[in-house]
């Protein structure tokens, strides 16, 4: 008899409280140098909520969080949720200009940040550069809604209120007052604004409701990927990114333990997973998983408890990881900030061959449509086009960007993802790249991802990224940036020769640029192609 899956929809605050009531002593979060139980996290989150209320933050207010992965980060996240506020996680790698823009655009009334020896940078210094007026008294002129600057890790200094002073204010607000605020939060109320970079000059804030950020992740962790026991989940990425935040929320909702670190280092990650018996891993991106399996200390026996590993990668890498971890199932998926993370994923019952080449099928409660990017007409199965998504998980819109929101939805409420997919007759989805990542070579459409996947069939190539180079005759031609496996040697001509006669001539890269592992320009989680295009433009002036 098939398992009955109950659709349980909760607010973000409720997700924590239920698990804290069910198993208060279980560890909710473990880092190499810190940990917190569900009971402790519940109490810390209430203390943050009470303190925020004490300084004047109210339901619906936006609260920015600029803290690396840590206990402080998650107590801030849930503290804002319990109060009924809207959390605005900030990228800890952003520089002053980016932070200044987001703090102003988001209309955050408070900022929870950190000044700790473990921080990658001195956040108060960068914030002073971003918002010079915080060095003075009065209104923060660069972000006029911002009234409270709080160091959730650190001591009071200037305009910044330190942890001890901030939490002391909680004594003026009762826990019952926060309980009343929590119970008033509705499932479709905003929970998060996740800023995502794209082709626009500034990041766009995706407004996500409580149902969007809890329903799918919790259902997956409890049922679809459930093993009968609370999961032990490892997340490689920063918790300001939906790709890591979503599995974290799922872990909390399933009463599991989430493993992470303030930064990714493969040896530390392996040791953490081995020590705590990881069952579900979310490395997501090729650079992360390659760092794991290529590390000198890697031994499949270290991950003997692993059941599932999520990865988005070319089939050659998926197959390699699956071969190295035969006891686990490698699963691909697709998602983005605008869809609160995953909107489709492979089923564990699918063959490994299918999971290597597809991104699975739409999740429950989510619809997809494949359309012609030019005309918007729906396309038949087997034809590549832009994938549109509609469902409970889709954002309500881009914050304070009505025009961009209108451009991103059609008249029937379908969100235009900008991703290219082909739907197979069995509803599985095959990724074809980004609409804006298509090259036009002499009138022929070339998907960069197709050439990248072929380049990775070369035994010496570890990573490949393809971009277009302007060409006076063909409009543009493909060129490739590649990273070789350590110790391998191959020249440009050999790689180009590998392509000739095996892919169409117009798809063959016209030039190969070799990259060391440390040379790739990175966004929060993946290689930044816009930076590669800028580098190419400089190189070919």
Where are these regions (language model features)?
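A short helix-loop-beta submotif of the ANL/AMP-binding
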Residues: 62, 68-88, 92-96, 101, ...
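Gly/Ser/Thr-rich phosphate-binding loop
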Residues: 167-168, 253, 275-284, 290-354, ...
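AMP-binding/adenylate-forming catalytic core of the ANL superfamily
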Residues: 94-100, 111-113, 391, 396-397, ...
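Conserved AMP-binding/adenylate-forming core of the ANL superfamily
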Residues: 6-9, 13, 17, 25-70, ...
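Conserved AMP-binding/adenylation subdomain of ANL enzymes
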Residues: 81, 214-232, 240-280, 295
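Structural core segment of the AMP-binding/adenylate-forming
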Residues: 55, 85-165, 488
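Conserved beta-loop-beta connector loops within the AMP-binding
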Residues: 367-388, 407, 425-426, 488-492, ...
